Amino acid sequence: MAKNYPVVSAEYQEAVEKARQKLRALIAEKSCAPLMLRLAWHSAGTFDVSSKTGGPFGTMKTPAELSHAANAGLDIAVRMLEPIKEEIPTISYADFYQLAGVVAVEVSGGPAVPFHPGREDKPAPPPEGRLPDATKGSDHLRQVFGAQMGLSDQDIVALSGGHTLGRCHKERSGFEGPWTRNPLQFDNSYFTELLSGDKEGLLQLPSDKALLSDPAFCPLVEKYAADEKAFFEDYKEAHLKLSELGFADA
């Protein structure tokens, strides 16, 4: 979809760059890239293309949205970010949380995802139940990412590769463990591990395994496992689209 990005002031652009520097330092110091990426994704992934509600508009800071089961643990991210936000009040929460996701990927060795400022904060959080369920298969992934958010099959597989960062926590999701050997390094190892089968100590969710059994998803898994550069290019595009759902639509 064509975008018509708002023009922001020089002062606002300066605030964005200051926030970027502060985020780099925080994420490097606290090794919290996976948590910040999850915050950005869960903030944006509530967008519903038919009703034009939800999306990356700063509502994750509300107790109502933080209480959604899929967001368990994200209150930690919100609390970690608040001192920077208080220091840089000019930037919207909407931009700030998406910028945190962009910086998380960059600091971890991933691609430089473009960032366009100008999202405005919205007061009302989306209803619960719009984020993907890790226990379900490819039909569910297409319903949530495709029909609800308006993303493509390629976007679904590329974004799944973001699980190269982080781990599941039993108390948050019911699952336990990392997807890869180095959960703080953004690379294509999610795909290589997925293709190599179950391994002790590494996690493969039902939604991960669904990528292998689907005739459209599996060739993309194989492509990204063989070609990290191709994965980075497609991930960059998919992350950008996710971070701008409902924002600056022409």
UniProtKB/Swiss-Prot annotation:
Cofactor detail note: Binds 1 heme b (iron(II)-protoporphyrin IX) group.
Induction field: By salt stress and hydrogen peroxide.
Family label: Belongs to the peroxidase family. Ascorbate peroxidase subfamily.
Catalytic activity: L-ascorbate + H2O2 = L-dehydroascorbate + 2 H2O
Keyword vocabulary terms for this entry: Calcium, Cytoplasm, Heme, Hydrogen peroxide, Iron, Metal-binding, Oxidoreductase, Peroxidase, Potassium, Stress response
Job description of the protein: Plays a key role in hydrogen peroxide removal.
Record-annotated membrane-spanning stretches: none
Protein known as: L-ascorbate peroxidase 1, cytosolic
One example of a Gene Ontology biological process annotation: response to reactive oxygen species
Record-marked site positions (Transition state stabilizer): 38
Subcellular location: Cytoplasm
GO cellular component, one term: chloroplast
